[in-house]
């Protein structure tokens, strides 16, 4: 799935769109996305000058966006009219810094999906090395007016 297809699903736009491509998909079960991290990312201006490091919370956000795509594709037409909202982040661990030039491989796997709540395990890798992991919960709700 390319960026144009991703933008039809996710409401996020620059500078907060954190997924460039979906490379593997089992709707409702598992999804793998890529994020190419470049020095042009606006967050590098302040995190940190002279030593740019991608903020860990944005890596977790990238996981949430990949999970959102997976959940959307597994949902019915009525749910697809809604927007997904974060509910919880548990057991987040930041194991390796992510730098400009890195490519994040973001893997999410469903733990459960019940009563409109999705729980997923997310992992982000750089060159096959685990950089970040977390468990995320989200739900779909009506768009704010």
Curated annotation (Swiss-Prot):
EC class: lyase
Record-level GO cellular component terms: cytoplasm; membrane
EC number: 4.2.1.59
A Pfam family per the record: FabA
Catalysed reaction equations from the record: a (3R)-hydroxyacyl-[ACP] = a (2E)-enoyl-[ACP] + H2O
Keywords assigned by UniProt, alphabetized: Cytoplasm, Lipid A biosynthesis, Lipid biosynthesis, Lipid metabolism, Lyase
Compartments where found: Cytoplasm
Gene Ontology BP terms: fatty acid biosynthetic process; lipid A biosynthetic process
Any GO molecular function: (3R)-hydroxyacyl-[acyl-carrier-protein] dehydratase activity
Active site: 47
Record-stated family: Belongs to the thioester dehydratase family. FabZ subfamily.
HAMAP family named in the record: FabZ (MF_00406)
Protein's job: Involved in unsaturated fatty acids biosynthesis. Catalyzes the dehydration of short chain beta-hydroxyacyl-ACPs and long chain saturated and unsaturated beta-hydroxyacyl-ACPs.
Protein name: 3-hydroxyacyl-[acyl-carrier-protein] dehydratase FabZ
Annotated organism of origin: Geotalea uraniireducens (strain Rf4) (Geobacter uraniireducens)
Taxonomic placement: Bacteria, Pseudomonadati, Thermodesulfobacteriota, Desulfuromonadia, Geobacterales
Gene from which this protein is expressed: fabZ
């Amino acid at each position: 799935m390319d960026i144009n297809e991703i933008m039809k699903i996710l409401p996020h736009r620059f500078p907060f769109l954190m997924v460039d491509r979906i490379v593997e998909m089992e709707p409702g079960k598992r999804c793998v996305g890529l994020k190419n991290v470049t020095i042009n990312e606006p967050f590098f201006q302040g995190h940190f000058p002279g030593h740019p490091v991608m903020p860990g919370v944005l890596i977790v956000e990238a996981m949430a966006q990949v999970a959102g795509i997976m959940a959307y594709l597994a949902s019915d037409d009525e749910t697809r009219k809604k927007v997904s909202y974060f509910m919880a982040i548990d057991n987040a661990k930041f194991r390796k810094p992510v730098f400009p030039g890195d490519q994040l491989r973001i893997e999410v796997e469903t733990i459960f999906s019940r009563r409109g709540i999705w729980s997923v395990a997310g992992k982000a890798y750089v060159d096959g090395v685990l950089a970040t992991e977390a468990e995320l919960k989200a739900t779909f709700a009506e768009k704010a007016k």
